[in-house]
Amino acid sequence: MTHQPQQSPQFFLTAPSPCPYLEGQQERKVFTHLVGDKANEINDLLTQGGFRRSQNIAYRPACEVCRACISVRILAGEFEMTRNMRRVWSQNRDLIGRVHKAQPSTEQYALFRDYLDARHRSGGMSDMTVLDYAMMIEDTHVNTQIIEYRRRGPDSFMSAKGDGELIAVALTDVMADGLSMVYSFFSPHMQERSLGTYMILDHIEWARAAGLPHVYLGYWVEGSRKMQYKIRFTPQEHLGPRGWQRFEG
């Protein structure tokens, strides 16, 4: 009889449920729990294999007939901003992002609720309470950071701290080969800033500065309008049957 080591992950399959991206489709997921002292290493390997993390669970689509969800990662070292991206970068030069341990705050939750109510009122996260939010942030056994974006203040050059209200937040896993953007949200009242795009650009710069080759964006679904933004950040790689393949757009 073969015994699995205690640290070996066990995988489970969910029951079918309506797909949140493609109308009329059913989704299933394979998942495992990220616990123990090998959680970081396992999360790195699974993310490189197309998994995503939510709290202490790593999952990936395992649909019976559909393969529309494609894992995407940006090649940070080769990335060049488009003219529009340079405009977004310049427009947000008054912001500063500060990296914290993955700890929730009432200020974060207020912004999170504002974001959901304005942009995802009917989504699966729309009824999340403050306790649900705290679990989303804190329930991690891997190297997870939270980045808070605020306007620069008069002392920001010395203190590396922003000033004023919280404008945007990113929950990010720091891995051996890159940054994985787990979830991000921002003020829905500042559409002219394109804050979602700005946070991705900021993560690319962070990865470059840290010598990390990739920024993982999760899944892209062709034909899904809410996912379309992800393929604007090129060059990038898509995960397929033959491994990671370069994609230029």
Curated annotation (Swiss-Prot):
Domain of life: Bacteria
Catalysed reactions, as listed in the record: N-terminal L-glutamyl-[protein] + L-leucyl-tRNA(Leu) = N-terminal L-leucyl-L-glutamyl-[protein] + tRNA(Leu) + H(+); N-terminal L-aspartyl-[protein] + L-leucyl-tRNA(Leu) = N-terminal L-leucyl-L-aspartyl-[protein] + tRNA(Leu) + H(+)
UniProt keyword Acyltransferase, yes or no: yes
Keyword Transferase tagged: yes
Leading EC class: transferase
InterPro entries per record: Acyl_CoA_acyltransferase, Asp_Glu_LeuTrfase, N-end_Aminoacyl_Trfase, N-end_Aminoacyl_Trfase_C, N-end_Aminoacyl_Trfase_N
GO terms of molecular function: arginyl-tRNA--protein transferase activity; leucyl-tRNA--protein transferase activity
One Gene Ontology CC term in the entry: cytoplasm
Biological process terms in GO annotation: ubiquitin-dependent protein catabolic process via the N-end rule pathway
Keyword annotations of the record: Acyltransferase, Cytoplasm, Transferase
Main location (coarse class): cytoplasm
Enzyme Commission number: 2.3.2.29
Location of the protein in the cell: Cytoplasm
Pfam families in UniProt: ATE_C, ATE_N
Family named by the database record: Belongs to the R-transferase family. Bpt subfamily.
Function recorded in the entry: Functions in the N-end rule pathway of protein degradation where it conjugates Leu from its aminoacyl-tRNA to the N-termini of proteins containing an N-terminal aspartate or glutamate.
NCBIfam families recorded: PRK01305.1-1, PRK01305.1-3, PRK01305.1-4, PRK01305.2-3
Protein name, UniProt field: Aspartate/glutamate leucyltransferase
This protein's encoding gene: bpt
